[in-house]
Design a protein with these regions (language model features):
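Basic, Lys/Arg-enriched alpha-helical interface segments
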Residues: 1-64, 69-84
Length: 84
């Protein structure tokens, strides 16, 4: 069962600014998030709270998706997209 993904407007702006070579990797990472959000990434604070709802998922070698898993709503909110 897939979870819908909601992308924050700031993350949408970051996506619009990504280089073309990052877009396929991002699409693949978002597909993984849709199918397995809790197991896809790693907690933003793995030492103190490994099961945290706010997680990071790397993509494309230098990209990072920061997202929130809303288990109750069966939804994923993408908060930030970064590319270095």
């Amino acid at each position: 069962v897939s979870c819908p993904i909601d992308i924050d407007p700031r993350a949408q702006d970051a996506i619009a600014a990504l280089p073309a070579e990052a877009l396929l990797a991002l699409a693949e990472a978002l597909a993984v998030l849709e199918l397995a959000p809790g197991g896809a990434g790693r907690s933003v604070n793995p030492d103190l709270n490994p099961d945290a709802a706010v997680r990071n998922l790397p993509f494309g070698g230098t990209g990072m998706i920061t997202y929130l898993v809303l288990e109750r709503d069966r939804r994923v909110d993408v908060l930030l997209i970064t590319w270095a």
